[in-house]
């Protein structure tokens, strides 16, 4: 199995290095990751400037100023030959649950892999300690995929409780929960008296009930949420069409 491995925490982050070491025991792994932390970069792609890469002695490749999406795009289309069989993103330092997937560079890297035609996993740890647990879970899933491919055409967003492996209760297939809207902005002043702003933390849990990714992780289970790229709200199409007809928009300008 040939694996393109990326992340959004940066090429030297403990999550990606722990996972790379574990994956290399049974797979051909090429790390292509940002040279620095790009958390929250979502699906951003660098279009107005060039990208420079640096290859380390162990073969890992850092993309200078690159986003997670840049890294996967370059990895698939230029840097990994032959091309990968699958794209894996992670292990992220912290969860990507509920609405987090909108902003997550970890999920975005997997999404880019799927967009380019490859199976893809995004892996996150609900903390900053037991990366070995998340690596073991990921390796188990990848070995299973190698034996029997999962042909859903979906991204698997995997969130692992920050627990020792022997305390993980199992795996649940889940849906995304939701958070309350975030509203924290932290102002500061620089030495010249100019105001700076820091984006605050994400909102608290809103829908974290049974069946959600939040609930699974809170209860000690690995959460696997299938995600797809099509953002169309199919159930709303008729509602929007009826509204347009009722208000007359489009019949005259």
UniProtKB/Swiss-Prot annotation:
Compartment(s) where it occurs, according to its Swiss-Prot or TrEMBL record: Cytoplasm
The domain of life for this entry's organism is Bacteria
Q: What is its EC number?
A: 3.1.3.5, 3.1.3.6, 3.6.1.11
HAMAP family attached to this UniProt entry: SurE (MF_00060)
Q: Briefly state the protein's biological role.
A: Nucleotidase with a broad substrate specificity as it can dephosphorylate various ribo- and deoxyribonucleoside 5'-monophosphates and ribonucleoside 3'-monophosphates with highest affinity to 3'-AMP. Also hydrolyzes polyphosphate (exopolyphosphatase activity) with the preference for short-chain-length substrates (P20-25). Might be involved in the regulation of dNTP and NTP pools, and in the turnover of 3'-mononucleotides produced by numerous intracellular RNases (T1, T2, and F) during the degradation of various RNAs.
Which Pfam families does this one have?
A: SurE
Family recorded in the similarity comment: Belongs to the SurE nucleotidase family.
Quote the cellular component terms of the Gene Ontology held in the record: cytoplasm
Name of the protein in question: 5'/3'-nucleotidase SurE
Provide the species name. Answer: Escherichia coli O17:K52:H18 (strain UMN026 / ExPEC)
- Keywords associated with the record: Cytoplasm, Hydrolase, Metal-binding, Nucleotide-binding
Query: Which cofactor names does the annotation list?
Result: a divalent metal cation
Where a divalent metal cation is bound, by residue? Answer: 8-9, 39, 92
Query: Does Chloroplast appear among the keywords?
Result: no
Reactions it catalyzes: a ribonucleoside 5'-phosphate + H2O = a ribonucleoside + phosphate; a ribonucleoside 3'-phosphate + H2O = a ribonucleoside + phosphate; [phosphate](n) + H2O = [phosphate](n-1) + phosphate + H(+)
- InterPro entries for the chain: SurE, SurE-like_Pase/nucleotidase, SurE-like_sf
Among PANTHER family, the record links this protein to: 5'-NUCLEOTIDASE SURE (PTHR30457), 5'_3'-NUCLEOTIDASE SURE (PTHR30457:SF12)
């Amino acid at each position: 199995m040939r694996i393109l491995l990326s992340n959004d925490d940066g090429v030297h982050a403990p999550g990606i290095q722990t996972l790379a070491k574990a994956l290399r025991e049974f797979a051909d792994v090429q790390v292509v990751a940002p040279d620095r932390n790009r958390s929250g970069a979502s699906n951003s792609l660098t279009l107005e400037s060039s990208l420079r890469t640096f290859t380390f002695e162990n073969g890992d490749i850092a993309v200078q100023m690159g986003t997670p999406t840049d890294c996967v795009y370059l990895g698939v289309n230029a840097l990994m030959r032959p091309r990968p069989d699958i794209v894996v993103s992670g292990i992220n330092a912290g969860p990507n649950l509920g609405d987090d997937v909108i902003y997550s560079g970890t999920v975005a890297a997997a999404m880019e892999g799927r967009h380019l035609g490859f199976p893809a996993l995004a892996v996150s740890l609900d903390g900053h300690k037991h990366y070995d647990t998340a690596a073991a879970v990921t390796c188990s899933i990848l070995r299973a995929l190698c034996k029997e491919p999962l042909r859903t055409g979906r991204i698997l967003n995997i969130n692992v409780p920050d627990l020792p492996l022997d305390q993980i209760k199992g795996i649940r297939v889940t849906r995304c929960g939701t958070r309350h809207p975030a509203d924290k902005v932290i102002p500061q002043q620089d030495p010249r008296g100019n105001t700076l702003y820091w984006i605050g933390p994400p909102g608290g849990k809103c829908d974290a009930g049974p069946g959600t990714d939040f609930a699974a992780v809170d209860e000690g289970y690995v959460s696997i949420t299938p995600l797809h790229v099509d953002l169309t709200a199919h159930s709303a199409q008729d509602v929007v069409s009826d509204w347009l007809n009722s208000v007359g928009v489009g019949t005259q300008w």
